[in-house]
Amino acid sequence: MKTTIKQAKDHLNQDVTIGAWLTNKRSSGKIAFLQLRDGTGFMQGVVVKSEVDEEVFKLAKEITQESSLYVTGTITEDNRSDLGYEMQVKSIEVISEAHDYPITPKNHGTEFLMDHRHLWLRSKKQHAVMKIRNEVIRATYEFFNKDGFTKVDPPILTASAPEGTSELFHTKYFDQDAFLSQSGQLYLEAAAMAHGKVFSFGPTFRAEKSKTRRHLIEFWMIEGEMAFTNHAESLEIQEQYVTHVVKSVLENCKLELKILERDTSKLEKVATPFPRISYDDAIEFLKAEGFDDIEWGEDFGAPHETAIANHYDLPVFITNYPTKIKPFYMQPNPENEETVLCADLIAPEGYGEIIGGSERVDDLELLEQRVKEHGLDEEAYSYYLDLRRYGSVPHCGFGLGLERTVAWISGVEHVRETAPFPRLLNRLYP
């Protein structure tokens, strides 16, 4: 019977065949231990010399790392294993032998591993991170579908940008200029006027020359837009969404979190409502904490965000930033028109902003004024202005960066490990 490592638990004390790769092995004179993986998990295969043909034991000692195999044997309980079971191997068939696999079981530098990312993905920890990424995506669809959102796919090639063009990748679109999208927001706002609540999930591109552990050039973003929704209601949806994702990973990725040695007690504390602190109060807090490199009207850097989030030891909303440091489409704060109705959700443990969101300007005259103030081409944004001409309503939206969120939940140091093939400032290969 052919099965997988994950499904093997349903076949205790039965003989099965599993297609797998050999990740590592060790042997003595009478027994060989094979570390096997098949994409669904990692399992140990035990080959006892006295219980198999001589050729099988000889093969078990000689097969090379990352060779592909069909392994047949009996699934038995093993309480020492993370899985709780292993295979007593009876026969081995080599599908393809690997020669001189470059990522041997020893320490390698980051650049070497990134050069071999196509192979590094096979390692146990990288496999665990990708499984957590997958669960975050699954839980995202689950949340939005249950809450009545419609999925909309905005274009990746655009003629205009939500936040100006300084950080956009330019390309030619036949005889026109085009840019790789840095957000689907403007299109989602249009879709929200048709469907009420919409979300998207897709790649975004930022031509930022950043080399921090938080930044990728290409990353995936989950964006939501909601009609007839105010800023406070939007924050509630955001915190419910993040809480749902964290709980789903805790429930469905226990083994992966264990492999990554993640301190799950920090994630177990994540619950609604999240703390909220205004930009004004955050500036005062930082001053009291000894930060003398930040003044009102300046954006926060990584050390500032980390200090604020670590104070709460939870995700925290920083609300109502100054108008002058935020994009043109954000609604003024009626209590202080030098600020806007927006919030950044900052993850604890130094992972930084994972969500940016705001209430959108819904008044045509104000939006036209903002477009001019920001030096944007009114013609390029005519479709966006139309949304305010024909039945404008209060509406809000937000975007969550997938890779940064996965980094926080999984506890990995650098965001590059949360994308299968990350695009960094100096890396376009593989």
Swiss-Prot record:
Q: Which GO terms describe its biological process?
A: asparaginyl-tRNA aminoacylation
- Keyword Ligase in annotation: yes
Q: Which UniProt keywords apply?
A: Aminoacyl-tRNA synthetase, ATP-binding, Cytoplasm, Ligase, Nucleotide-binding, Protein biosynthesis
Q: Reaction catalysed?
A: tRNA(Asn) + L-asparagine + ATP = L-asparaginyl-tRNA(Asn) + AMP + diphosphate + H(+)
Q: Which Pfam families match?
A: tRNA-synt_2, tRNA_anti-codon
The record lists its disulfide bonds as none
Ranges in a coiled coil: none
Please give the GO cellular component terms listed in this UniProt entry: cytoplasm
Q: Which GO terms describe its molecular function?
A: asparagine-tRNA ligase activity; ATP binding; catalytic activity, acting on a protein; nucleic acid binding; transferase activity
* Record-listed E.C. numbers: 6.1.1.22
Compartment list: Cytoplasm
Q: What is its main location?
A: cytoplasm
Q: How does it assemble?
A: Homodimer.
- Write out the similarity annotation: Belongs to the class-II aminoacyl-tRNA synthetase family.
This chain belongs to the protein called Asparagine--tRNA ligase
Which species is the source of this protein? Staphylococcus aureus (strain NCTC 8325 / PS 47)
Please spell out the taxonomic lineage of the organism that makes this protein. Answer: Bacteria, Bacillati, Bacillota, Bacilli, Bacillales
